[in-house]
A protein has these predicted regions:
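N-terminal beta-loop-helix "entrance" segment that forms/cooperates
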Residues: 39-56
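PAPS-dependent sulfotransferase catalytic core
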Residues: 206-228
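An anion-binding loop in the catalytic cleft
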Residues: 222-289
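Donor/substrate-binding cores of folate-linked one-carbon enzymes
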Residues: 25-29, 90-209
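Short amphipathic alpha-helix with an adjacent loop that forms part of the alpha/beta core around
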Residues: 76-86
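Short acidic-hydrophobic, aromatic-tinged amphipathic segments that line or gate anion-handling sites
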Residues: 66-73
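N-terminal Rossmann-like dinucleotide-binding module
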Residues: 2-44
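Short, well-ordered alpha-helical microsegments
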Residues: 16-18, 80, 100-102
């Protein structure tokens, strides 16, 4: 029954594409995809479709099927009418990057499943993966929950813990791992959700923590701090490695030396000492140190 239920998938970036790919591999094919519009990317500003759109376009082309793709700039009345016409049983949301209003959440018959790459109620918000790395956590995880009008707030259907070594694992690797686990948890949860036999648990608001969206400025590391870490200041070395790992690839870690910007692409700690591995000076290609 669960595989026959109609659902719409909301998601835009790489994390969402990995989740969606896992769902498709598990036999859960969305009726439609909702993602952000195509955007100009890179120095040449080439208009590029989001990763989820690319995935669905490739799937539709190779499987002779037609998954509708909706890319609203705003979740307005016209978009809501399009969704209602699809008559979905439920929604799945993974890193959609827009606040979804009640008027949209009220459309599906069964409600909306959200997936969030943290152990809710910890690390709610825009940057859970970056934030756990920056904080030096040793455990993180992923959560499947019932979405409501508040951010990452609804009752929890399932969670899975994932051990974490922030001195080894960078953002890209952790994102991949958590997205794959999220897809697996969704595949386990959806049948129970559709059949009405899931047992969600209320989040403990007293334990809620929140994350923020990071900018380029958050990735700046004073060169004096870098120098001290290379000289053996282990506390500074660990923080710098965590910063590089958290902001790989975006917004990136960087420093300024002699008035020139240097991107810090890869580093590690050895015996409490910072070892830079890969850097990139402005106007040059990346190189090993």
């Amino acid at each position: 029954m669960a595989n026959n239920a109609k659902f719409v998938f909301f998601g835009t970036p790489r994390f969402a594409a990995i989740v969606l790919d896992g769902l498709i591999a598990g036999g859960f094919i969305p009726t439609a995809l909702v993602c952000n519009p195509d955007r100009p990317l890179g120095r040449k500003k080439i208009v590029t479709p989001p990763p989820t759109k690319q995935l669905i376009a490739e799937y539709s082309a190779t499987h002779a099927t037609d998954v509708a793709i909706l890319q609203p700039e705003k979740l307005d009345d016209a978009f809501i009418a399009q969704l209602r016409a699809l008559r979905p049983d439920f929604f799945v949301v993974a890193a959609y990057a827009k606040i979804i209003p009640n008027a949209v959440l009220a459309i599906p018959r069964l409600g909306t499943l959200g997936t969030h790459p943290s152990l809710l109620p910890l690390y709610r918000g825009a940057s859970p993966i970056q934030s756990v790395i920056l904080a030096g956590e040793t455990v993180t995880g992923t959560t499947i929950y019932r979405m409501d009008e508040k951010m990452d707030h609804g009752d929890i259907f399932a969670q899975e813990k994932v051990p974490l070594d922030v001195l080894i694992t960078n953002y890209s690797a952790l994102e991949m791992q958590l997205a794959k686990r999220s897809a697996w948890l969704l595949i386990k949860t959806i049948p129970l959700f559709v059949d009405g036999i899931a047992s969600p648990q209320v989040q403990d608001e007293s334990h809620a923590t929140f994350t923020k969206k990071f900018t380029t400025e958050n990735g700046f590391i004073e060169y004096s701090e870098l120098d001290a870490a290379i000289a053996g200041a282990s506390d500074k070395a660990e923080l710098i490695v965590r910063t590089i790992h958290a902001f790989d690839p975006e917004p990136g870690a960087w420093t300024i030396k002699d008035g020139k910007r240097i991107k810090l692409l890869e580093a590690r700690m050895a015996d409490g000492v910072l070892k830079l591995i890969t850097i990139q000076r402005d106007g040059e290609t990346a190189r090993n140190v």
